[in-house]
Amino acid sequence: MYHGTLVHMTQEKTEHQLVEVERVQTGVRIEKRMLKVLKAIVEQKDITLGDLLEGIVLHAFEGKTPFSPQTLKEIEQFKQLYGMTLKAADSHHLKERKR
């Protein structure tokens, strides 16, 4: 998991206490503009998309916010840039466009 300014340093572990895990390759479908925002974050923070997603999920599982106030501001800018208007209330209410 990423241990920089993107993710709050709320974990008791430090950078020197890395946890060994087994990762698997997976394919997921995700909303196009959301992926653009996520890719912009990983590019800016110099991390992988997998690291970002793991950090978001681990924080969510503990009811914690995964982003610093500064990163949240940056995310808002990326959302505007890529026209992402989806909100949390839209979760589980998305319908895929027919091609």
Regions found by a protein language model. Give the residues of each.
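Short amphipathic alpha-helical segments
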Residues: V28-I30, L38, D46-L58
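Short, positively charged interaction helices/loops
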Residues: A60-R99
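Short coil/turn linker and secondary-structure boundary residues
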Residues: M1-Y2, I47, F67-Q70
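Short Lys/Arg-rich basic patches
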Residues: M1-K32, V42, G83-A89, E96-R99
